[in-house]
Amino acid sequence: MNLENKNSFFLNSALFFSTMGSTATTLGFITYIFNTTHSPFNTGAVTIATLLVGMLLGPFLGILVKEKGLMWSMVVPEIVSGFILLIFVFIDNLYLVYIIAFLIGFNNKILGIARLSFIPNITNDLVKFNALLRSINRFALISGSLLFSVIINYSLTMVFVIDAIILFQPTYFID
């Protein structure tokens, strides 16, 4: 497995930052809902909104990724998610959180399918590369939780703004 491959570096970097930001945003949504409603039911509902995408649309999203192409599927959903988060920052609405969580879950599902489909273009050693991706993913989940913990001390809105900025980062990796 050649980790010096430029595409490997870009994919792994994008995965790390995207997952880190998404983790912080998910925790931000949960915190926002609980602080606004003080309802455990509503807090759980925002998590369900992100998971529904995989259940309802997962089987069909692979077709969308194939039709649109891998590069489109790895860049456009991140940028769209960034704009969606910025809209939420300016339009502070409780019910909008559920729609945004669903849309971001939709974009993340497309992105996940595209990333996994792109791996054979980078390496023939799929087992090692998948293990590397899982390790990066877990490290990003921990880093995202830490990022959230630090930023929440200043502002919940800042969590969403920082993730929106992070979501625009795939444009820097386009060749």
Please state what every model-predicted region is.
Residues 158-175:
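Symmetry-related core transmembrane helices of the 12-TM Major Facilitator Superfamily/SLC fold
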Residues 24-41:
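Short amphipathic helix-loop junctions that connect adjacent transmembrane helices
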Residues 30-35, 143-163:
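Transmembrane alpha-helix termini and helix-breaking/packing motifs in multi-pass membrane transporters
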Residues 39-47, 130:
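Juxtamembrane helix-start elements in MFS-like secondary transporters
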Residues 79-93:
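C-terminal ends and interior cores of transmembrane alpha-helices
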Residues 25, 34, 84-88, 104, ...:
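MFS-fold secondary transporters
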Residues 10-26, 50-62, 74-81, 96-152, ...:
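Substrate-agnostic recognition of the 12-TM MFS/MFS-like secondary transporter fold
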Residues 37, 69, 91-92:
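Helix-breaking motifs and short loop linkers at transmembrane-helix boundaries and internal kinks
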